[in-house]
From Swiss-Prot:
Residues 457-464 are annotated as: G1. GO terms for cellular component: cytosol. Residues 507-510 are annotated as: G3. It comes from Thermobifida fusca (strain YX). The gene is infB. Residues 597-599 are annotated as: G5. Residues 49-352 are annotated as: Disordered. This is Translation initiation factor IF-2.
Amino acid sequence: MAKVRVYELAKEFGVESKAVLAKLQEMGEFVRSASSTVEAPVVRRLKEAFSQSSESTEGAKGGQEKKKPSPKPQPSPQQQTKASAPSAGGETPRPAVPKPGPGLKPGPRPVPKPGPRPGPRPEGGAGKAGQQPSGAQGPARPESGKTPRPVPKPGPRPGNNPFSSTASGMGTRPTPRPPASGGTGAPRPGPRPHPGMMPPRPGASAGGPPRPQAPRPQAPRPGPGTAGGRPGSSAGGPPRPVPRPGPRPSPMNMPASRPTPPGGARPSTSSRSGGGRGRGGGGGAGPRGGGAGGGAPRTGFGGRPGGGRGRGGTAGAFGRPGGRPSRSRKSKKQRRQELKDMQAPSFGGVKIPSGNGKVIRLSRGASLADFGERIDVNPASLVQVVMTQLGEMVTATQSLPDETLQLLGEELNYTVEVVSPEDEDRELLESFSIEFGEDIGSEEDLKPRAPVVTVMGHVDHGKTRLLDAIRNTNVASGEAGGITQHIGAYQVTTTVDGEERKITFIDTPGHEAFTAMRARGAQATDIAVLVVAADDGVKPQTAEAIDHAKAADVPIVVAVNKIDLPTADPQKVRAQLTEYGLVAEEYGGNVQFVDISAKENLNIDQLLEAIILTADAELDLKANPDMPAQGLAIEAYLDRGRGSMATVLVQRGTLRVGDSIVCGDAYGRVRAMLDENGNRVKEAEPSRPVQVLGLTNVPSAGDSFLVVKDDRVARQIAQQREARERFAQQAKASRRVTLDNWQKTLEEGQREELLLIIKGDMSGSVEALEESLLKIDPGTDEVAIRVIGRGVGAITQNDINLAASSGAVIIGFNVRPEGKNSELAERMGVDIRYYSVIYQAIEEVEAALKGMLKPEYEEVQLGTAEIREIFKVPRVGNVAGAVVRSGVIKRNAKARLIRDGVVVSDNLTVESLRRFKDDVTEVREGFECGIGIGYNDIRVEDIIETFEMREKPRD
């Protein structure tokens, strides 16, 4: 239970806070202010004390009411005349109005006692009781001949409305403040009211509705001299003028009003007995009869005279609802949650509920805000936990690596699962009710499709030459350096057993830098053709291609190339491939080997036949051509005239011109499609490679593409993919900065970095070049490579501006600057390097890294001299007379003093060097000289050795 504050107790008791503070001090409890908290036992004692005091107060009030005397006798006319004198000069407080008894019956009733008058009243001029001025009203006196009914005289009640005077007919006169209990005091008149600020009298305002009153019988008119009338008025005088209403008063100045109960007089609800503010009597049935008899109770704080509700009862006070605070019981769920929070483990002062092994799925690059949202915890608390428990400095919105999220989950007893990119993309597509990777429809909807064949192997083993022989083209002659540096896709038609069959070939690079391309080609293929040179045998990239094919679970057909060379040995190749699990059919295996010569065009038809037989025997290649197209982006690049272009392989469905397509983080509408020969096509069926125009940007090679119903869905999917990939890259690039490696991180921040901006003609080439450059090992931590920009297409002005501001080097791979950007780069001093072969770029960047290394120095001995004599020179010190034993002694060279083979002093300098009386710069072997080294503790036969530090090349 929460502790209660003093002001809350005061509100509950209906008293002021200082009264509660005083009571606590009487009880011996020390509290500082009304905002201090009070313990539960003290609250109980305080409630008992206040309940006892309230009972005693009520008993005292009851006794006082019993001891109240009867109404005083009416004063004599002389006393009334004397009493009227001070009222003429100023406002004199008048006595309280007698409180009428309950349920007045028709008949003779007591008339109000006339109060002091300003002058003698004319005879016969008595008005109605409801029309008498408030200042001339006193206790009621019975009519002559009638027995008056005793009415207890209530005590005076103080009025808090300064605008209650009726001297000018604008309201009632202020009521005098009652004296303190047990004593008497002179009444103090209130301030004179301003006529414009006086509230209109109820029932007398022009246009105001009359106050509802119960009908009462008319009281007999008092006789002459028995009731106070209006000064200067008589029975036959003119009627009393109705006061004109002033301006609308402020609600704070309005007197509180309540509906008049039957009987005309309103009962007082004050906490202590007191009369009303108006004149008494409850007159006749006139418009003001009895209107002010009871007076309106003051709305004040509890415990004060005239107070209504308790302290804080005003609605809206301090932003709280009106009335006393309610203490409702907490539900079981709230109590259970509080108990759970109390039992939650604390991490560095932060309580976080335990996960109890609950599994939390987070995407790549998630932040603490994402984690906190999943477990319903404030991210600021998680930041504190990471800093105190894991020792890492992070922010709530920073993308975190997967291992950091998993470590945090272990600390909080959660099992964190980082969603893989494949699952992430599948969940994204499922949110749009899209299924990727499966054919839609029944078995009857599936139709045969052409096999997709990937040609793989080591560099320079003849892969592209083989495709040229199959297509009767000469692609290899146009490639830079004679090597393939991007993926090419082609579809050819061959005749097998008199039937035309289509085969789609994918040519992959064989250079070691294109590992990702070979893996991508193997994933998109049905059959892998492994090309091995008969004169070279199995090489590293050959073994890597075998691993990719086995990982993709595709059958392999081996083409032993270059059998026309005199050094060719096909049997040796078969024996080597046996070690990798590829056993030829003639050796009892299930792998087909075909000996070919791509250059001489030998046995090419046999290779195509072997591919078709393998596809028919081991694979059931079918697809639904009627569904929306899905497939894979093999390559992508930026064309100057056509914009973003992507070479895609349709795997399912049919791609048509005008379809809305999304490929990775790129989207658009298919404007045109081209085949491998540059001819326009209107649709592409399964296993057909085409070039697509119309994408918003260049996608990454290897991204999947699919056709959606409209451009809006394509845009949403592409934007969400881009955002997720960006978060993943941020998490990958962020380095874990812990308290343990803080100093090391600061030192790494001071190391040299080679900043690069890579621009290439193909997306796959840029990817391969970046991966190869980041793998360069300079052999030290002093330098590093950081790629700050990459892209496909010509070198733009934005690339040059970025390089100029960051000091980066631009690498153009088969691209050039557009327009006058080359001149801009020269003016801004930006270094642009152009390459057409990937290994040339790798070699030069590696050389540049080594050139950035800090130089290393080695010590080289110059010469030695033996001391023969010691000379004392004034203001200089001891000077050695020596003979040069070896090498050369040079002035300002570094020196050390050696005595009996032990270094006596190091870090000395040859300050002076003389040959006889001449200053010289050096003295060679065999000559005598005077040497001053600035060191006086020298002895005969000491050796002076001179040396210098020379820079040595870094390996």
